[in-house]
């Protein structure tokens, strides 16, 4: 099933602005997994969501100096404008870079992460079906297991390619 909050606006399934403003009351202490999740979330919000999870972490650390610089003045940051222009996740990206600033300022010992980090299923229905039927190809294309080419699986593109390769057309 699905969970839908009663409120109309300020909720985790709301707009980018609503998601960017949300913070948990109780934070989670720093750990390698928390930092990795924050790095993946940052890359996702910057539009780098089609590369592997490891590459998203690497992408974030490659841009860390710019991320920390952008956190000083997000409104006037050229880097932030480059990675958030016309993005659906601009405010979430701002929240993520401010979280990196907090980690930098407090240090790992005193840091608590209050930022909700969304984890999106690739295609949850196909993921469940692939797992239950032990369909290796389906599991690879829905990212239940690692793809052999170390790519992010994309079941929708595989289906679309199959349809087009078999001569189906849309009229």
Q: Residue ranges of each PLM-predicted region?
A:
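Non-catalytic nucleic-acid-binding interfaces of large nucleic-acid enzymes and RNP effectors
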Residues: 2-171
């Amino acid at each position: 099933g699905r969970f839908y909050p009663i409120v109309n606006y300020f909720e985790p399934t709301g707009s980018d602005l609503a998601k960017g403003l949300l913070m948990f009351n109780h934070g989670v202490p720093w750990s390698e997994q928390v930092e990795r999740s924050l790095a993946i979330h940052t890359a996702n919000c910057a539009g780098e969501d089609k590369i592997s999870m490891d590459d998203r972490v690497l992408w974030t650390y490659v841009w860390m100096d710019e991320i920390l610089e952008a956190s000083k003045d997000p409104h006037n940051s050229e880097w932030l404008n480059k990675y958030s222009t016309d993005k659906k996740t601009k405010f979430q990206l701002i929240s993520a870079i401010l979280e990196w600033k907090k980690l930098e300022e407090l240090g790992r010992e005193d840091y608590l992460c209050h930022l909700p980090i969304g984890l999106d299923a690739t295609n949850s229905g196909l993921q469940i079906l692939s797992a239950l039927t032990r369909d290796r190809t389906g599991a690879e294309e829905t990212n239940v297991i690692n793809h052999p080419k170390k790519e992010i699986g994309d079941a929708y593109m595989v289906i679309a390619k199959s349809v087009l390769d078999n001569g189906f057309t849309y009229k």
